[in-house]
Amino acid sequence: MKKLLLLTSVLAWISGASAEEKPKLIVGVVISHFYPEWMDMYGNELSENGLKRVMKQGARVNVNYNYFYTQTGVDHASIYTGMLPTEHGIVSRAWYDRLRRKRQYSTQSDRYTEIGDQQADSIKSLSPDYLQTMSLGSAMKWNNPMSRVFSVAMNGDEAVLSGGSSADMAIWFSEKTGKWVSSSYYCSELPEWLRMYNTWVESDHFVNKGWMMLSDEDKSAARIRLTNHFYYDIARAKKEYNTYRVLKATPYANTLVRVLAEKLIDEERLGVDNDPDLLALNFSCLDYMSRDFTIDSSEEKDMLVRLDMDIAALVSKLDARVGKGNYTLFVTFSEMRELMPEDLRKIKVNSDYFSIFKAVALLKSYLGLVYGPGDWISDYDQGQIYLNRELIEQKKINLKEMQDKVADFMIEFEGVAKVMTAYSLTHTSFPEGVNRLVQNSFSHKRSGDVFFCIHPTWVSE
């Protein structure tokens, strides 16, 4: 298995164990859409016990993802397997299943049901069935069957793919109930401690609290509105949209994960013996915040300060419960935060949004003119276009020819920097550059027929 460090973007870890000693507990923290420059911008606002401690007491490694499509799930599978998407199989958040003629999400499963919600018996749930290789948790259990593996996230994809195929349980947040749920892939029901934990819906506390700057928490909403500071009425938003999803775009999402993780460490007795355990945590509120706020906004700054507090609280818990020198903590980032056109235009950088929906609508019209009426496109998503191969075969059209025509058409759109076909990716070995990155994300069975990359300063809608 390749080294775990290979695919991480920025990694730091702290451990008091010597090279000859095994840690009793490994804790992985993956933060989505983090902007590293925040550490310089707001470093004075952070405590010495959170991210600064991780950086100072641990080792820091700067490396780059060596594949093209960094997305939720893809990155988590890559981090915890140490392999490329072309190897572990999670090539995208979703792909088109040609045999079943429908879109397949990376962890979606018809074989299992959701557990943790009394009304969820018939709700289809998630599983790591599409993960094609061993992950860190699987390797740990292979070496020591007594090892325990758990993962916690607000999103099911992150929890499932971080834990891997051999996890004792992956736990994620229910947008419907505000409680923690899992899948019958792992067990028939939640453990007693988690069922009891769910009886008090902690998320309601944060919903009713609202979101304001940390320094304003002792002020009323009316007083906050008299200042230039922000206040978000989460309870009103939840009532309007009838979902706990509104919490995911607040720093409270990270806190919910951290608090549950601390409870899990106690109840499952992680790190108490010489059988090393794994706890994979995912902090993903920035995934929902990044397109709503600029990188220098008060909201993003408040998120960073609160994230730092969560990291500090987690490390303090590990010190007290597992003991200094008995655990290893690593922190890494997935899905680097996009610089939005609104940010870049301030410094006169050419930037805009690329609409795949408009592009595909024009592409369909073009293919209709060239090849006649027909549903020539089966699906499209995240820089990939899937052609209707069954129709192409029926009409006795050369697949490579149509792939080339689609590529020639797509490259003409403003904002598109490069286009590649599945034929070129399967018949050519690219040693470097963007072509190599795309090839590392390519699966002959799961990827599309045509791939396109937009300019670095553009953003897909």
Explain the meaning of each model-derived region.
Residues 1-22:
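Bacterial Sec-dependent N-terminal signal peptides
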Residues 22-27, 57-61, 87, 145-149, ...:
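Loop/turn elements at helix/coil->beta-strand transitions in domains of secreted/extracellular proteins
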Residues 23-35, 54, 79, 140, ...:
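Beta-strand elements within well-structured catalytic alpha/beta cores of enzymes
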Residues 34-35, 47-51, 75-79, 132-136, ...:
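Stable alpha-helical elements in mature extracytoplasmic
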Residues 35-41, 64-66, 122-127, 244-251, ...:
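Second-shell loop/turn segments in exported
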Residues 40-88, 148-152:
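Short, structured active-site-proximal loop/turn typified by the sulfatase FGly-forming signature C/S-X-P-X-R
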Residues 62, 69-71, 93-123, 165, ...:
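Secreted, luminal/periplasmic, and some membrane-associated catalytic domains
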Residues 84, 90-275, 284-291, 411-418:
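His/Asp/Glu-rich, glycine-adjacent segments
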